[in-house]
Regions:
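Conserved N-terminal phosphate-binding loop of PLP-dependent enzymes in the Aspartate aminotransferase
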Residues: 1-352
Length: 352
């Protein structure tokens, strides 16, 4: 769970507290600290690790890092090490962090792996790109930054079987989608990957990332195996403690409530768009997504202008959302907030 450099055999030490230049172990012994504040394993990281292992069925072992970008980078790296292969299959408009995204424009900061890019939800196109030299397939069970496009269950089932057949690694990026079901969208779809990456809200507002999977893959990081997972702040006490607290707050009932509000908002926006569209014309705006995640799409020649108009109109109505049309319902939103936003969209379409 911790950076490799804080582990040592035969008796790894867990730190309970620190003061001045001293640290105290869990068994009460105080040590003069010459570790340059590198820290060490702490109680909260064990609690958070258990929370995540209990919550996500595909995770038998988990390791922590500082962001979703790091989590995906580490997952891809260990998948290549585990399989001994280099090629990775990704999907158009997939976003897996600062160094692994595949939008409309080439990203000069992408890590230089051997990527092949398939069309999301397109089984036939993906079949064409499958090969026995693939190390991994990585995808979100719902495209997030790519427009809140849910995966078709049959598409995920196809990928699961294909990866099993070629003995590669299937990675679900659930950094966003894990908030949509208490056990992640993998459980909603009943399709389970070999590895799962996590981040964002699971750190309780602090920098956080995590990646985990089955024992065989995660054992590649065991001492003596030669694969080093470093990071001074991987298991920092603030993120671990905030993550534990957030995990206790995020209950199945609260997720269901947020999802219901998101469904209502999505339906309301689509209804407003249809109500005010000129006769024999297509609605200018379409809301997609799943549960508490809503994505706005614009049609026609003036898509960017329309997107900007919606954003600034909503700001004028004291409603703040992502400029690209990214809307996330959280645990403290109530039905009257959703009604307010739907009425704001009514006002926008009336003025339009």
């Amino acid at each position: 769970m911790s950076p490799n450099y804080t582990h040592f055999d035969p008796f790894p030490m867990t730190l309970a507290s620190g003061r001045d230049c001293y640290v105290t172990s869990l068994d009460g012994k105080e040590y003069l600290d010459l570790g340059m504040n590198l820290g060490g394993p702490n109680k909260q990281e064990a609690v958070l690790a258990k929370q995540l292992v209990d919550r996500f069925p595909s995770i038998e072992k988990v390791r922590f890092c500082n962001s979703g970008s790091e989590a995906n980078t580490m997952a891809l790296g260990i998948a290549m090490a585990y399989t001994g292969r280099k090629k990775i299959l990704v999907f158009e408009n997939g976003y897996h962090g600062a160094f692994t995204n595949f939008g409309d424009h080439p990203n000069p900061f992408n890590i230089p792996h051997d990527f092949v890019i398939a069309k999301y939800n397109d089984i036939e196109h993906t079949k064409f790109l499958l090969s026995p030299d693939l190390a991994a397939i990585i995808l979100e069970p719902m495209l997030g930054a790519g427009g809140m496009i849910p995966a078709a269950k049959g598409f995920l089932q196809f990928l699961r079987q294909a990866v099993t057949d070629i003995e590669a690694v299937l990675i679900f990026d659930e950094i966003i989608t894990s908030r949509l079901h208490i056990h992640g969208l993998q459980t909603h779809y009943n399709v389970y990957p070999d590895m799962t990456t996590l981040g964002k809200y699971l750190g309780g507002g602090f920098s956080f990332g995590a990646f985990g999977g089955n024992d065989k893959i995660m054992a590649m990081f065991n001492p003596g195996r030669g694969y080093f997972h470093s990071g001074t702040y991987n298991n920092n006490l603030f993120s671990m403690s905030a993550g534990v607290a957030a995990g206790k707050l995020l209950t199945e009932d609260k997720i269901a409530k947020a999802n219901a509000l998101g469904d209502k908002l999505r339906d309301g926006i689509n209804e407003m768009a249809k109500t005010y569209v000129p006769e024999d014309a297509l609605p200018l705006t379409r809301a997609t997504g799943f549960g508490s995640q809503v994505g706005l799409h614009y049609v026609g020649d003036g898509q960017e202008k329309l997107r900007d108009c919606v954003f600034f109109y909503m700001l004028d109505q004291a409603i703040y959302m992502g400029k690209r049309g990214f809307i996330s319902i959280n645990l403290v939103h109530e039905e009257h907030h959703i009604d307010l936003v739907i009425e704001a969209f009514r006002g926008f379409f009336e003025e339009l």
